[in-house]
Amino acid sequence: MENDYNIPSQTRIGHVHLKVSDLECSLAFYCELLGFEITTLFGNQAAFISAGGYHHHIGLNTWHSKGLPPAAENSVGLYHTAILYPTRKDLAKIFVRLNEANYPLTGASDHLVSEALYLNDPDGNGLELYWDRPKEFWNYTPDGSLIMATNELDIKSLLEEIE
């Protein structure tokens, strides 16, 4: 097939909808720990949650997954959902919140263009919590490719944002 179509540049991903095994447990994680707000509840089967009043950034449902175990790690499916924080200070605050709750991280990386925390929700769905460095600090190769890496995140430096 010839590719003569480009998706409009203003297109954005509006939301992600996750299958979960226990709606209450997922709402506790996303709302009580991460700070999202419930915008719509669909009985005890599903919910829409949001940051900042949007109708929903994340949908959670148990329609085909109630009480089931997480998908196998070595299987096809969604790798992670990335949640963009507006500032480095905001990323530091959620790091402290996760740490105080003893919630385990699966990683913490400096990608040169961004800094990121990685974790799994209660159903094993991967999450990346990150902030982007300003674009004027991004570097490119001579051919125009963005230079990125997966370096260890300097947690001490991150925490200095809120001291």
Question: Could you describe each region identified by the protein language model?
Answer:
Residues 15, 55-58, 80, 111:
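Histidine-centered active-site/metal-ligand motif
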Residues 2-5, 66-71:
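Short beta-strand/turn micro-motifs at beta-sheet edges
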Residues 40-41, 70-73, 108-109:
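Short histidine-centered beta-strand/loop micro-motifs
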Residues 62-65, 132:
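Acetyl-CoA-dependent GNAT
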